[in-house]
Structure formats: C-alpha cells, structure tokens
Amino acid sequence: MKQYKAYLIDLDGTMYMGTDEIDGAKQFIDYLNVKGIPHLYVTNNSTKTPEQVTEKLREMHIDAKPEEVVTSALATADYISEQSPGASVYMLGGSGLNTALTEAGLVIKNDEHVDYVVIGLDEQVTYEKLAIATLGVRNGATFISTNPDVSIPKERGLLPGNGAITSVVSVSTGVSPQFIGKPEPIIMVKALEILGLDKSEVAMVGDLYDTDIMSGINVGMDTIHVQTGVSTLEDVQNKNVPPTYSFKDLNEAIAELEK
C-alpha cells in the first residue's frame, strides 16, 4: 500500500456510527499521530461546529482538534463569502451552519428577499421554512445545498438526509442547487488548500461510495474504502471506478501501512 503524506477522513460510518465508535478508528488516528502524518476530518455534517465535532470524537477517546475538522457548513460559508462578501442568506439548518455563515460575515435573514438560499440538514424543518426557501429561489436567490446525502445512518437506521430536504425545494422550483459537500470537488479543494499538499500526496478515507469515495475520484485522489458503514465490498467492487483500496476496517489498513 502506498504511503501518503496526509489523509482526509470521513466521520459517519468511518470513525463512528451514531454514538458508537467504530473498531479501528482510534487506532488509526493514534497511528497517524505517532507517525506525524497530518489528517483532516472531512464531513458532510453541517449541523455541528468543528468544536462540537471535536468534542464528540474526544468522548470516544479519538484525538481531534477543531482546526482538523472541515464541515460542509464551513466550506459553504467560504464558498459564498468568496463569491459575494456580506451577502444576505436564508438558511435551513442547525447551529453549525448558522455559526459558519455568521462568522464568515454573511447576513442571515428570515424572509425570501435574499441573495442566497442555503439548505443544510434541519431536524426541526417545517412547511413554512420550506415555503420561504422556495419563494427565495423563485425570487432569484442563488440556491446552495451543503450536501446531497439523501439518507444518514443513525442508531435507529437510515433516516432522511439533507439531500431529501433539498429535493423538496428543487422539485418545487425546478432549480437544481449547487452542492458543496462530498462528492463535489469544492469541499475537497478546500481541504487540500488547508493541508498545502497536492492531490497525489493525499488519500480520502471513507465508507460510502457515492459521497466519500466519489469525492476522491472526482478530484483525482486515491481512495481508501472501509467496510464499516453503508457501502459493502461487493458494492464497491461492482463500480466502474472502484476505490484504490478496500479494507474490512481501519485496523486492516494499519496492518497494510506497516508492511
């Protein structure tokens, strides 16, 4: 197995499943730290701040720092502020997205007369929120969605994800959003900029083919699939472009790296 200078690592289905740590997750991060290999946690979760993500990982005894976390909310805020500094935004989403947009100098409004409509996972979504978002897009606001995941793994099973919520506005308006998170290149380019490395020197680690693995493939990066989440070995082997590697878990990846 190739030795990489850095790793981009998914969270849900790779580091943990809901509130449960996945076997090999802590060991993999400890291995990288001992070797002095940089890594970033790249997640489509827009509901949490980097500090909240870090706290969850630390509760599982997985080493993490806020500056090592790249969320779809952060990438979304950067994308908008680079295009339109100080723009007005109507958003659906949690505290992670709200904080990211505000700290980027964007103005959050509660009506449809805005420059951007941004949809992130909103566990308190209502018809009225969707109505305002729909009217905003119809009024000409640029339509952004933090990530396309139609479902998310939770302890109860696969629940509706942000892509499912986004589809309501998209179907109603006939307008397709610009997605920011995996598998789009936008969030991956942001992570590579933080690392200061070329894509050939970095590998993407994740469980879900359609987002994690495709995000690496879409930017020309090697990919490491772990069979600890949604996509099985059979799933990824049958794809036109399979991952560079597929392991039962991250313990198996460590064993390969140590050869």
Curated annotation (Swiss-Prot):
<comment type="similarity">
    <text>Belongs to the HAD-like hydrolase superfamily. NagD family.</text>
</comment>
<comment type="function">
    <text>Catalyzes the dephosphorylation of 2-6 carbon acid sugars in vitro.</text>
</comment>
<dbReference type="Pfam" id="PF13344">
    <property type="entry name" value="Hydrolase_6"/>
</dbReference>
<dbReference type="InterPro" id="IPR006354">
    <property type="entry name" value="HAD-SF_hydro_IIA_hyp1"/>
</dbReference>
<keyword id="KW-0479">Metal-binding</keyword>
<dbReference type="InterPro" id="IPR006357">
    <property type="entry name" value="HAD-SF_hydro_IIA"/>
</dbReference>
<dbReference type="InterPro" id="IPR023214">
    <property type="entry name" value="HAD_sf"/>
</dbReference>
<dbReference type="InterPro" id="IPR036412">
    <property type="entry name" value="HAD-like_sf"/>
</dbReference>
<dbReference type="GO" id="GO:0046872">
    <property type="term" value="F:metal ion binding"/>
</dbReference>
<keyword id="KW-0460">Magnesium</keyword>
<keyword id="KW-0378">Hydrolase</keyword>
<dbReference type="Pfam" id="PF13242">
    <property type="entry name" value="Hydrolase_like"/>
</dbReference>
<dbReference type="GO" id="GO:0016791">
    <property type="term" value="F:phosphatase activity"/>
</dbReference>
<protein>
    <recommendedName>
        <fullName>Acid sugar phosphatase</fullName>
        <ecNumber>3.1.3.-</ecNumber>
    </recommendedName>
</protein>
<dbReference type="GO" id="GO:0005737">
    <property type="term" value="C:cytoplasm"/>
</dbReference>
